[in-house]
Amino acid sequence: MAADPIHQFQITKLFTLGHVGGQEIAFTNSSAYMFGTVALIAILMLVPGRQLVPGRLQSIAELSYEFVANMIRSTAGKEGLKFFPLVFSLFMFIAVSNLIGIVPYTFTVSSHLIVTVALALLVFFTVLIYGFSKNGLKFFKLFVPSGVPIYILPLVVFIEVISFFLKPVSHSVRLFANMLAGHIALKVFASFVAMLGALGVVGWFGAVLPLGLTIALTALELLVAFLQAYVFAILTCIYLNDAIHPGH
């Protein structure tokens, strides 16, 4: 029988940290992989040091730094660089956790909606708090596009408000759905290879096609791992730009 493709997303308790208000606080496999992701990022950014002639790890760290910095400058301007720590942390966390999830028998943190919602809400409340603290009531200009005829302005404002509060939904579901669907497809085709290979010589020939598809999907998932981190980060920059420059 083929392995359940959903089993890879199951959260399991490793040990109990304590109880708060009668509720158990558990350390799970998801928590472990989050800590592991942060540890890998710390190693990548801190261990290489600041050599005049950069090695491989230092080159990757510097390229990642400049990539995110240029992303912020192009979408939110130089003023947006004050949010560099937030955007860089989100980009690296999502990218590294996605890459870890591609390794067989590991856990994909971003395949759980609760994780992506938490990240999206972090961005959403950052935009709200900074937008009002910097602009005050002028932040509401975000919901009033310039050049809109007065007779349709109420409808446009209503649509703008709804779309603004739905941003965390689309921001989180996009990442969650892409990682979930990709890993399920990869697991299904890999299971086909295992089942056909177990049939003997005849099954080996039949396993060629699903094996090729599995390899192709793995390569695609490597691309998607970076692409989804980029999409999440670029949308974060766009939303932050709304807080920095609320006028359309």
Curated annotation (Swiss-Prot):
CDD domains: ATP-synt_Fo_a_6 (cd00310). Its main location: membrane. It is a multi-pass membrane protein. One of its GO terms (molecular function) is proton-transporting ATP synthase activity, rotational mechanism. The keyword Cell inner membrane applies. Keywords: ATP synthesis, Cell inner membrane, Cell membrane, CF(0), Hydrogen ion transport, Ion transport, Membrane, Transmembrane, Transmembrane helix, Transport. The keyword Nucleotide-binding does not apply. GO terms for cellular component: plasma membrane; proton-transporting ATP synthase complex. SUPFAM superfamilies: F1F0 ATP synthase subunit A. It is found in: Cell inner membrane. The chain crosses the membrane at residues 27-47, 83-103, 113-133, 142-162, 192-212, 215-235. F-type ATPases have 2 components, CF(1) - the catalytic core - and CF(0) - the membrane proton channel. CF(1) has five subunits: alpha(3), beta(3), gamma(1), delta(1), epsilon(1). CF(0) has four main subunits: a, b, b' and c. Belongs to the ATPase A chain family. NCBIfam families: ATP_synt_6_or_A (TIGR01131), PRK05815.2-4 (NF004482). Key component of the proton channel; it plays a direct role in the translocation of protons across the membrane. This is ATP synthase subunit a. It comes from Rhodopseudomonas palustris (strain TIE-1). The lineage of its organism: Bacteria, Pseudomonadati, Pseudomonadota, Alphaproteobacteria, Hyphomicrobiales. The gene is atpB.
